Structure formats: C-alpha cells, structure tokens
Amino acid sequence: MRSRSNSGVRLDSYARLVQQHTILCHQNPVTGLLPASYDQKDAWVRDNVYSILAVWGLGLAYRKNADRDEDKAKAYELEQSVVKLMRGLLHCMIRQVDKVESFKYSQSTKDSLHAKYNTKTCATVVGDDQWGHLQLDATSVYLLFLAQMTASGLHIIHSLDEVNFIQNLVFYIEAAYKTADFGIWERGDKTNQGISELNACSVGMAKAALEALDELDLFGVKGGPQSVIHVLADEVQHCQSILNTLLPRASTSKEVDASLLSVISFPAFAVEDSKLVEITKQEIITKLQGRYGCCRFLRDGYKTPKEDPNRLYYEPAELKLFENIECEWPLFWTYFILDGIFSGNTEQVQEYREALDAVLIKGKNGVPLLPELYSVPPDRVDEEYQNPHTVDRVPMGKLPHMWGQSLYILGNLMAEGFLAPGEIDPLNRRFSTVPKPDVVVQVSILAETEEIKAILKDKGIDVETIAEVYPIRVQPARILSHIYSSLGCNSRMKLSGRPYRLMGVLGTSKLYDIRKTIYTFTPQFIDQQQFYLALDNQMIVEMLRTDLSYLCSRWRMTGQPTITFPISHTMLDEDGASLNSSILAALRKMQDGYFGGARIQTGKLSEFLTTSCCTHLSFMDPGPEGKLYSEDYDEDYDDELDSGNWMDSYDSTRNARCGDEVARYLDHLLAHTGPHPKLTPTSRKGGLDRFRAAVQTTCDLMSLVAKAKELHIQNVHMYLPTKLFQPSRPSLNLLDSPESPQDSQVPSVRVEVHLPRDQSGEVDFQSLVSQLKETSSLQEQADILYMLYTMKGPDWNTELYEEGGSTVRELLSELYVKVGEIRHWGLIRYISGILRKKVEALDEACTDLLSYQKHLTVGLPPEPREKTISAPLPYEALTKLIDEASEGDMNISTLTQEIMVYLAMYMRTQPGLFAEMFRLRIGLIIQVMATELAHSLRCSAEEATEGLMNLSPSAMRNLLHHILSGKEFGVERSVRPTDSNVSPAISIHEIGAVGATKTERTGIMQLKSEIKQVEFRRLSVSPESQTSGGHPSSIDLMSPTFLSPAACISASSGSFPTVCEPQTSKDSRQGQWQRRRRLDGALNRVPIGFYQKVWKILQKCHGLSVEGFVLPSSSTREMTPGEIKFSVHVESVLNRVPQPEYRQLLVEAILVLTMLADIEIHSIGSIIAVEKIVHIANDLFLQEKKTLGADDIMLAKDPASGICTLLYDSAPSGRFGTMTYLSKAAATYVQEFLPHSLCAVQ
C-alpha cells in the first residue's frame, strides 16, 4: 500500500469534516435532502444547494488528486451524494408541477413553488399563504448548479419528462426581472409584513441560471437534441438591464444587501460591468461589514435583542430600534474568500481567511464550526448604540450553519490548491466582466416584389426578393413566438410550454435550423398587425435605429446578429413609384457601414450563413409528443375545401398537399394568427377558383408564383409559403368616393354631422346610413360610424351592401385601413380608440417601466382621477384602468397607451433620461406636450390639440424625447408638405438657449373630460345647425378628435388663451425658466441627492407639510436615506400638488430647508409648512419688484396658487433668483429655532 501524500491526508481531514461532523451526517438516506439544523427538520431549497457544494468540490478534488483506488471510490461516493440531493430537490419540485404551469401565466405568490419541504417525504410542510414561498433566487440557484454540475460530468437528469420540467422551470424564472418575490431572506420588504418586492439577488441569480442552461444538454455526453435546454436571449438581457438599474441597491426597501455578493461574484457572476461590481462590493464593505462578518442589510431585526419573538411582523417605526445592533453573519466572509480566489486577489483571500478563523467555534475534537450569526448581548445594547462595533458579540442560531460551513470548506479547498476555478465553474461564468469583441450587425434587405426590387436597384441598392432567398424561409416574428410556445410541452405532466410573448430583437437576429431548413424572422416592429406605429415609415426607421443600437450593446452570442429587413409596398411614396425618403436615407446609411451608432454589414442572406448565429431548434424534431400540429389537421382538410369560407382556410389546404411538415405547421400557425379579409371581391372568384385548382396540383414554389402571375392574382406574396406580409383588405365602395379638398390636407374645421330625425323625433338611422354612403369626407364618415357604434352597437348591420360585410365594426375597420394608407394620424388614433385596437406591447411596456423602479400614473391629478400603477397588470386590467383615468375619452386613452410605449422604448435604450425620476405621470406629460405646441405655435388650444393628435408617431416620440431630455426645443409649422399630405407639417427641432421659445403661464390645474357632455351635444344637434366656417378660431369641439387633453383642459378650466400673445420682450429667453419648471414638475424631476437631504431634514423636525399633506418624521424610523421606498413616499406627498411649476417651486423650497440639516442644532421646529415659505418668498419678491417700479400688470398672480408669474420665470440663482427669496423666507419662518448668528440672511 502506498503511503498517503500530504495532499491526500489533508483531503481525508476535509472528508471527515464533511461526512462525520457537518453536512453528510445529516443527509436523509432516502430523499438525499438536508435538514436546516437539529431542531429544524425542514429542507430549504437554497440551503440544500449551497450546503452540498462542499461535497461536490470535495468529490472533484478526490477525482483530481486520487492517490489510490480508494480515493476514486471516495470521489464516486461523494459525487453520488450530490446527485442524490439534487434529485431529491427535483422530486420535491416536480410534485408541484401544477404550480409551475400556473405560475408561468400568473406570476402570483399563491402559485409559486414552495421554499421548503419535508426532509423525509419531499412533501410540502406549510400552506401556500403561510410562508413567503416565492423565492426566485432559490429556484435559480438550483438551476445554476444543475447546469454547472452537469457540465462537470454528473448525471442528474434521467428522462425526457424531467428535461421538459427543467425547461418549464426556465420559463418559471425567465420573468424574474418583472416579478416581485420575497427574496433570499424570505421576508420581502424589510418591514417583514409579507410584502413582496423586486430583488436584485433574484434577478441576478435568474440571469445567471438562464445563461448557464442555454443550449446545455442535460444528459451530458450521452444526450441528444431532445435533451437540450433552450433560453431566449431577450429574457436574459431584460434581467441584465434591470439588474444594472437596481445595483448597488438590493430592492425598494433595502439600499444595500450583503447577499449581492453572490450576484456580483461566485456563484452567479451576473454583472458584466466591472465598475458596478466594485461599487457594489464597496457599498457592502462600507455599510454592512463589522467585526464578526457582515449584516444582511441595514436595520435587520432578525435575532437582535430588540426583536419581539412573539410577533412575526415588525411595526414600521420599530425598524429604527435595530439600527447599529444588526446581527453579523460570518457567512459573507466566505463569499469574500471565494471572490478573492476567482479574481486572483490573494491579499483579500488571506485577510478574510484570517478573519474567519477568528470567529470559528471549535467543536468536539477541535472541529472548526461556522456559526450562523453573532448578536449583541441583551445587557449591552445601549453601549452598542452609542459606540457601534465595539461590544463583544455572542454566537447564535444554527451551529454549524451548513450553508456557511459548506462555502468555508469550498474556499479552503480552492485556496489550498485542491481545486482550480475552472473546475468549480466549468461553464466559465467567472469571465463575465471580460470585454466583449465589437459587434457588426449584418442586415439583409429584402424586397416584397420584383417592382420594389427594381425601384431599389434604380437607387443603387441591389437586393433580393422574398422568393429569391428560397430555400431560406422568411417569417414574421410572431411565428417565432408561436414556435417557442411548443417548447417544453408535455401532455403527461400537463405542461403547456412557453407562454406566448412578443419576440425581442435578439431572438429575431439569429438564424434558426428547423428540420434541416434555415429560417430567418423579421423584427417585431414591422408587423403591421400591431398598433398603428408600424404605419409610420419614420417610426420604422427610428425603431430600426433603436434595435441596431441595442444589438451592438447587448449581443453576447457566438456569431454576428443578422437582421432581415423587408421593404414592402407601405414603404413607398403615395405614387408607388419611389421609396419613402426616410427609408431610403436609412438604407444608404446602412450601406455606408454605420447607422444608429452601430457597425453595419449589408449583404445577401446566403452570404451571412457562415458568419451568423444559428440555433438548432431541436424541440421541433419528432419526439415523444408526436406531431407538432394538431392531429385532426389532415382530417379537417376535406371539410375546409368544401366549406364556403374557403379563403379563410386557404393556407391550411395548400399546405395539406405539401410534403414539408414544418411548412405546414408554420403556415397553419399563420392562418390562425393573421387577419383575414371579411369580403372576397366577387370579380376575382373565377380566378381564385382556378388558382385553388393549381394549388392542389403542385407544391413547387416557383410554379406557384408563375401560375399566380398568369392568373393575374394580386398580392402574390400572401400565398407564398413564407407568409411575411399581410394582404391589404379589399376596399369597400364606401371609401371609393373621391376625396374632397378637406381630406387632402388636415382640415382646420371639423364637420358637424346632422342627425336626421323621423316624425317621432327619434334618430332616423336609415337616413344616417344614406348620409354615410353619400359623404366624401373621411372625418364625417368616422363621425357617423362612431354615432352608429355608440347608439346601435359594433355588430349592427347597416345593410349598406347586399353581399354583406357592412356591420359597423367592419366599416370602421375598412375606414381604418383607408386612413392608414393616407397617414391621417388624427383619424387613425380616433378609429383605433373606437375599435379598441390592442397595443400588443402595452403590458410589456408597462412592466418594463415598473421593472426599472418607476411608478406610473395615468390621467391628470388630483387623485382619485389620477390612477397609480405600482405593479404589473394584465393587459385587460391595464386598459380598463387607463380608460377609467381618461374618463371615457378615447383619444386620451389611445394617446396614453402610445406615450407609455414610447417611454418604455427610451427606458430600455436611454435610462439616463429618467435619472432622479421615480414616478412617470403620463397625464401631465401629455398636458405639457399640448401646452408646448400651443405656446410654441402661438395658436389656440384647439389648434394645438389638433396638431398633437395629428402628429405622426415619430414626431410624437421626438417631442417626448425633447421634453424628457430637458433640452430647449422649438416647434414650428413647416412650409414643405409631409410625405402623406395629411398630417400637419409641424417640425420639432433642438435650439440653443438664446433661441429658446417663449412659454407663458398656463395655469392648468386639472383635466375635466367632457365625453358625456360632448356625446349628448352631438346626439342632440338640431337640423338647423350650420357647418362651421373655415377660420381656425371656429373649431367644432364636438368633433371626436378634440376629445384630447388640451381641448378638455381648455373647456374645463378656460386657462388656455384663444391665441397666444405675441412676444413683446426683447429677451428671447423670457418664459424659459417657467417652462423649465413646468417640465421638471410634470416629470417629477428633482436635483441629485434630493431625497437623502429630505431624510436629513426630517430628522430635525416633526414633518413637512405640503398643501395640507404631511410627510412625517416617523418615516425616517422605518426607512433609510437611500431606499427607493423613501423616495416614492416623498413623491406621493409632492404629487398632491396638481400644478407642475408650483410643485417645482415647492421642491426648491424644500431644497433650501435641507441646507439647515447641516447646522448643529437639535430641532428646527415642529411641522414645517413648505407652502408658507413659498408664499413668504413670493411676498418678498413682490415687495422688492414694486420698489423697483413694477406695476400690477407686470406682477400678475397665478389665480390657482397666488404666486407671481415672474417668480415662476426667475432663474434659481442671482440677486433676483428664487433661491435668494426662498432662503430669506426659510430663515424668517424658522428663525426662532436658529442661532442668532444665522438669522441675518443676506
């Protein structure tokens, strides 16, 4: 027998420590699970995974350093102990498969997997609502180490059913970036009142698990295509974005948490920004580290002497008692040791190993045991309060703490050289901060038709058509969403697969290998089934620019991203003979190699096959679930052929004769997700009959195209296997009447519809239908259809045409197509609101904004009209809430949804625009947009309203960006026509300070919707009513297009002037500061560090009062200065002020008060009325101005707030600046509490 080497002896000592004293001695021999401790027999998922890591590491070390055969046996035994535990946890979770299925759709805490199980039986131990079960980090850390252990050679997953379950666990955690849970400490909000919140630890761990599992074969080297896990890259990047936004904060209620060490370093390595990693680490060291370890988070009451063991939850004001006496956990020093090993920082490793050795407790036979935590002795609490980190603490809790003990042993194995970082991290997650190579985005431009190809060639752009890229197949993005919805399906386990969600740009920028056929998918934004945004060519260019920029910064996959950008007939000018100028300019820039800050390589799809990222969708291959399309697919074939609704089933019948199963499946999906024309042109029936016969006899694509052309079938592309573009709906005769001059440009006057009456005085609907048929005005058609919609219902048959298809809904849909073709944006928005067209990305846009810790409000203040959205809502609930806040006004509702989508776009690409903004008030933003147009164009509120509603989506988005960015901008009428000749020619451009546009005070306080009054007036129009004239001042407010913010504001408050006064001041900057305050107030923008300063001032008074609403000083007893929760609390008080510029002046007054927080006095008063300070400052301002000769006209006051308009328009600094007067006012107000030397403020 060979003698043992020193390393062998050392390994044996660690084996005894693990097997006989600390971990494996507690493992259940049947389930493989580990109890939390001697007195807590339940098995926590997270604790079990971390506790087995030492066993896994020891097994790897034995396998690597085996001296003799017994060592190899020992390695196998240890590794199988790991497999047994991981499979035990798998059995626990797989017994709750119904919860996994439900949670994918609900994200509800009631549908979550349990956090702990019975060690002996794998059964649940407490009820769904009796514990904070939703802990996404626990599920994620299990999946992360499942991936790492599988990559290291362990075989944990044994069947395809288990593979499908793991795939569904991926769906379970992929929405972590928008799911509030209870976090790693199971408590949620730190008040421990069962309030879930978005936790950085959960988001980071989920991101790591998703990346680790992507394309991983769970059967290891013995696997095949069916055992591979698939992850959508866009979900990973959502987690990455939210994580970067959260850090170094841990959640809304925790400004820092030591658990973030597991996110920025081992095991997750989830952060790619090395600077952010260092910032977060230093925050933990600075705020949480003590003599015995680190606190979990500030004001953590767990096992402190002041915690009441008889109560589960804390009182909010009670949290102040835990400050400076939080328990310290040696566990976190083990993370610092591992971090030092992975980062190569030997000094850090040595420092924390020595520190940890000092707090270890020697057990029986000198075994080193790591206690759970160290607490302040009850009799020395006051001493610790006075001098933090000076009192000697005592160990408490579990001994050993298996989670910490395991990481301690793992750290020692690595520090002593038994394990290399690559062995414990075979998936190389430790290289996350290594700079990535530059990304070159490959763009393949495709033409819808040969005609478009010829037009592009005339411009020097050589492209292919859809047909020419065959056998590569092109599909819209929604088809990829449907394909992924079959991933993970398992009928035996009742798992439905991935929920249908819109596909992100990362997903559509890959090529896909599906049964030996290459597919490419077009970006989501060009899908015209969506909202009307895709009708605007400039908006398409902007969305393309955004996607290209996003790809450059977020692409992490092997190979280059490839975007397939189709040019359709909708991207042509109205004559159909030339390309839209915006599209053409974008194509030329991409050909030059740069667009939107991204490096571009244009070319043919076939040229990109070798350089693109290509994913094999192995789950589309035949598997145990059988065919991927319904079994009755072929059985329905004959029925569909014989049915009268043949066109609706056309796609299925064609594919039923094709031999390609994948094409049949994809086209079957398309047939059920694309719109179908309600009417078939009778003039084409013969041709379609012959075309149908041709389809039945051939599957060859080119033959199909040739026969279609011979039969003069229009829109050939709608019959191709690659159903990229949707057919245009046939135009009804209603829309074929020649356009009147009013429709060729934006009418300045809206048409009053005359309601015909019968002899009994009731509305004569047949006469109204006749009027509908005869009128040539699109606006009047929309008005008549709206009245029919509200009075008779959407399904009322107008009997306009004998062949049918003349219900109100169908006629509105036809009108929507027509106004979409001519880009009449006011009517597009109006009809979209009537039809309740779904903004498919609305709920995702709302969720994205909330995920960045931004609360949303819709409607205008005050509450209850202004509705707050603080948690993700389903689409139906969200639209209902918006409708309620809009008080039934369709235009406001539609505009609110549109603005929400734009805000989400900017949040994803330019989050810096929203710095120091914790609540986005969409109603006020719309109000400011209308106000800016009214004053910049010097027009009436009605004209500004019409201009706002008729802005193209790209112009609306541009205006929003200028308002968010804080840059000075101008709005003016353009002399050159727009591309559509319909939308108003308004240009928005950035200008310098000297050329800033003048804005005058609006005094807008509220939005009072008049939808009911307007409807009543419209329905009771007398026959004698005359049509208005053509002067802009005689605009008919009864037109539905005027049910927009500015018009309603004007009607309710009368604060809008009919026509803006011309500028009389020589100073072109007059109104600049008032405008700036109005914008900042509407956006809730505050100075950097404002909330921390408010927290300090609350320490020295009883509270701050704003318009009767008090921000109490007790808030500081619950919340710390850096909490988002505190910032939102302050916002909720300030938002009681409906007028934006007045609100901003109150912010400035509070900022002056915060300067007093640095003065060494105990108190500066009881409750400070902030508005009184502002009014004192206003009086001082008026008094001084009068002494300088200002008259009453110049010093006019705002009737709503009583503040002089000149004060609103004063710069903050300078002799006559607002800060000067506010400082004097604050000193006057609180002088009785200040030292005499500070009372004389100059």
Curated annotation (Swiss-Prot):
Known regulation of activity: By phosphorylation of various serine residues and by calcium.
Localization: Cell membrane
Job of this protein: Phosphorylase b kinase catalyzes the phosphorylation of serine in certain substrates, including troponin I. The alpha chain may bind calmodulin.
Lipid biosynthesis as UniProt keyword: no
Sorted UniProt keywords: Calmodulin-binding, Carbohydrate metabolism, Cell membrane, Glycogen metabolism, Lipoprotein, Membrane, Muscle protein, Phosphoprotein, Prenylation
Pfam families, alphabetized: Glyco_hydro_15, KPBB_C
Organism (species): Rattus norvegicus (Rat)
GO molecular function, one term: choline-phosphate cytidylyltransferase activity
Post-translational modifications: Although the final Cys may be farnesylated, the terminal tripeptide is probably not removed, and the C-terminus is not methylated.
Gene of this entry: Phka1
Family (UniProt): Belongs to the phosphorylase b kinase regulatory chain family.
Protein name: Phosphorylase b kinase regulatory subunit alpha, skeletal muscle isoform
